Amino acid sequence: MHFSKLSRRKKGKVPLPPLPTAPLPPHRPRMSGTWCPPVHNVPGLERNWYESCLRSHAAFCGCGDFVSHLNNLANRLGRPPAPRPPGAPQPPAVRALPALPAPEDRFPNPPGWPGPGGGAAGAGAAAGRDGGDGGDAEPGDEDLDALFAADE
């Protein structure tokens, strides 16, 4: 008998069943990586552009003369403005508006406040005084002394 761990026969690992996985999407190259310079020279590029305009016009009109249609559209809708020369100063994006006029005074002489002491308050305000009973805005020293004496 062998009681040592080293002498025991090792059991094999239990294989796990494979998990279903979603296939990876194919790698799509970016558009900037697929661009290459044109293979035509300048007259060939101009010819291809003219034919593309002619065929796009033929997609909605059967007259075959897209140049006259472009001229009619330009006359009817207005031509685009001419480009500014390079290095010209940029015009201001938003023009400054003049200040708004002062609002009209809707109540030049407001009536007195309705309620108790309203008539006196209105008269006091008109005479340069403040307060609900037409008196002074700030209490005098005598009023404060009387108030503190009543508190004691």
From Swiss-Prot:
Where is the chain membrane-spanning? Answer: none
Composition-biased stretches (Basic residues): 1-13
- Biased segments, Acidic residues type: 133-152
List compositional bias (Pro residues) regions by residue number.
15-26, 80-92
The ranges of region (Disordered) come to 1-28, 75-152
Under the heading InterPro entries, the entry gives: HEV_TT_vir_Orf2/Gyrovir_Vp2_N
Q: Which Pfam families match?
A: TT_ORF2-like
What protein name applies here? Uncharacterized ORF2 protein
